Amino acid sequence: FQCSGITSGQTRTVTAQDSDLIMAGTNLAQSFSKPQTGALVTLTPGSTVAWDMGLSNNYTLTLGDNSTALSNPTNEVAGTSGSVLLIQDGTGSRVISFGTHYFFAGGTDAVLSTAGNAVDRLDYFVQAADKVHCVVTKALAAS
């Protein structure tokens, strides 16, 4: 399906087979009868981890380096929220540091669980393009 030549304020009629066309608006309240689910995107592990927030709302990162820096995310949009599963590899005791866009309660970066295969969850809310509010829930059941 392709639209062209439609400008704001115009009305068009679209004919499509049942269940072939799903449209959502960006400027109105909407209700959905089923969950709207984004992909769980795997961040590439390493000593410095790049995070493109434009790919999804939910991510997973397995820590395998002794020290990992989570870089400031790209494509931050105010109002975006989601989660990042932070998973220790089998060795454990991996540490993480955060870029300057991340803000935690009390002004202190989160310290992760250190057991091998431990799972922590970082929940985030983007206040502005350079302000990502974060909270970490530690020691969740293994994934």
Give, region by region, the residue ranges found by the protein language model.
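Acidic, glycine/polar-enriched metal-coordinating patches/loops
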Residues: 1-28, 61-143
